[in-house]
Amino acid sequence: DKVLYVNSPRFTNLDEPSTQRFAFVERLRAATSELDVRDAGDLLDPMRMVADDFAMKNLLAAIEVTGAGLMEGMKVARPELTTRQVMETVDYVFRLRGADLGFHTGVSLASDLDEELQWETTAEEEAARKGDARIGEGMLVHFDAGAQMNHYSADIQRTVPAGPRFTDEQRRVYEGVLAVQKAVIGAVRPGVTWQELHQIAVSMLSDLGGWDESYTYGIGHFIGLEVHEHGDYVGPLQPGMVLAIEQGAVVNGTRVAFEDDVLVTESGHEWLTRFIPIEIDDVEALRREEPLVRLEMLLRGR
């Protein structure tokens, strides 16, 4: 018999019907009876879904560097600068620490949005990430970044105020979305499925007043040799898997989103990115710290 293994990407929106996801494979099977078309994921996924010691060492290093870069960017972001200048600050720290970019660092305005933040194509998303918007007074700034160490990438998001403190409305949205993030991370353990985690987020965002309407993507993905790692997104989680848990909402033009890297352990989980400020008091305290990258250097390039 002739066997054809097809490596069909598994990273997709969890709400998308599986019949659409694997339509290509079904067409191959219908085209000829001479081929036994099988999913290459059955062979490859177990090798990549569970991190060995080498993978964990490099993922932890990537997370540490990403945290350092993000915290510097979170300190720097303010009305005197543009999103590109803040982005370059994050990337500078990555390179200073010997890391590559797992993907193009995204720094964008998260206030006064008139539509959901989503793109039809990868090219559109990359173009948006490379934008250069002026940060305004009272705005929120959103970060999405991941350093890469020895081909292993982190993937982390944070949202911060451009000023010293969140406004009351920003605080309201932030606290709501943060509660969802904590609940989903708290539910991570062996035996739970991605779909169950996704439904926790959708249900809680809906209960907040229909906030789930702007949540147009899945709850997360594996990380490893690829930022959006291949794997089994249907079966139960296993110890040793490293996940990126992400969700957020756009409420009256204000966007808050988080993404955290989480290790599935034998007894539950370990929140690997917890050291990066996420509580409101911690974020505001970080905003009061002096950045290592001097603002004069950035302002000179305006």
Q: Which positions does each model-derived feature cover?
A:
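Active-site neighborhoods and metal-handling regions in enzymes and metal-associated proteins
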Residues: 1-302
